[in-house]
Amino acid sequence: MSQGGNANINGARLEKRVEYLLTALNFTFAKQHKYTSIYGHKAQMDFYIEDLDLAIECKNQEGAGSVAEKIPYVMEAFLQHPAKNGLLIFGGSYWATKPGIKAWAESRAKQSGKHIQVIYEQDLERWLEQTSSRKAA
């Protein structure tokens, strides 16, 4: 299978995991939430939780590839999306080898004027559980 084909499978796996956890924790959400891109075109954010006004984007990368180069665009997409809150989830083993990418995204998030968080996939379940607890309180 091509590198691109593997990337699509791994990206779909991450999205399925996010969907499973959102469902298990009783979040009501939309998949492939439509908005207008920075270029004025139709675009989709992976998930949107209306109760939290939270847009979620998943990026998975297992090894060398171009996903990391898309992170600046993803951060701009959060600014363009109408949600006040954003969550960027890094899945795959690649991100731990390049911590500067997460640090850059977090720095950009702080400058954005929105509440955007950047987490690794392994922290997702705990993050969602804490968010669910805060929502219930």
Describe each region flagged by the PLM:
Residues M1-T36:
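Acidic-basic catalytic patches of nuclease active cores, encompassing PD-(D/E)XK
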Residues T28, L52, N85-G86:
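Residues at the starts of beta-strands that form the adenosine-phosphate
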Residues I9, G91-A137:
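Domain-level recognition of nuclease-like catalytic cores that cleave nucleotide substrates
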Residues N26, A83, G113-H115:
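A generic structural signal for alpha->beta connector loops
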Residues I56, L87, Q117-I119:
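Hydrophobic/aromatic beta-strand patches that form the interior of the parallel beta-sheet core
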Residues N60-A109:
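Catalytic cores of nucleic-acid endonucleases
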Residues A43-I56:
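Active-site beta-strand-loop-beta-strand hairpin of nuclease catalytic cores
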Residues G40-A43, Y73:
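Alpha-helical scaffolding within the catalytic cores
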